[in-house]
């Protein structure tokens, strides 16, 4: 009688173990249960999806902050000589918007731009007899403090002559990117 009892006990334990395993592994655990996303970010399968203007594992970082500050520009355009001058990037109206003062060492009015993650976009805009547009990106992760570098690709077109001055925006003209150092 001991052998059949032992066999029933083992079969019962095996059935209970199998049932527990099925229940345990078939449960969909909420991967977002312990995740808190800042700045109206939304957790999706354990990963925060950030609102525009924010980044980081928990959407805790304002994207444009790495661009804000004073920069030294080093550049040579397709029709201008090498130049060095200061610019300043300041926050603007929305969480993604910025304004750039002393852009091109020419403009009296600020140039408008916006930031998405590590890229600064200058949308096409016309002011002071010129059309300007471009993009720039951070080349270092160390830009929240004192140091950082932006490689800026942009173009300035004189509206009177329609002659462009290119700074790495179009590859075929062999122009060089403008380098902005903090």
Please place each PLM-identified region on the residue numbering.
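Sec-dependent bacterial lipoprotein signal peptides
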Residues: 1-27
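Beta-sheet ligand-binding and adhesion/scaffold domains
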Residues: 77, 114-182
């Amino acid at each position: 009688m001991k052998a059949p009892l032992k066999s029933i006990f083992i079969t019962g334990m095996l059935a209970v173990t199998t049932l527990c395993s099925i229940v345990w592994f078939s449960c969909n655990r909420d991967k977002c249960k312990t995740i808190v996303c800042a700045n109206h970010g939304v957790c999706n399968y354990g990963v925060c999806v950030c609102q525009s203007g924010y980044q980081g594992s928990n959407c805790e970082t304002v994207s444009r902050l790495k661009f804000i500050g004073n920069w030294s520009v080093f550049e040579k355009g397709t029709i201008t000589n090498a130049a060095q001058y200061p610019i300043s990037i300041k926050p603007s109206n929305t969480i993604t918007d910025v304004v750039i003062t002393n852009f091109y060492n020419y403009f009296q009015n600020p140039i408008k731009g916006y930031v998405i993650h590590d890229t600064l976009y200058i949308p096409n805009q016309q002011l002071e007899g010129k059309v300007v547009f471009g993009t720039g990106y951070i080349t270092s992760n160390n830009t929240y403090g004192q140091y950082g570098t932006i490689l800026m690709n942009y173009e300035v077109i004189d509206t009177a002559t329609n002659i462009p001055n290119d700074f790495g925006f179009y590859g075929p003209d062999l122009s060089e990117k403008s380098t902005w150092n903090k």
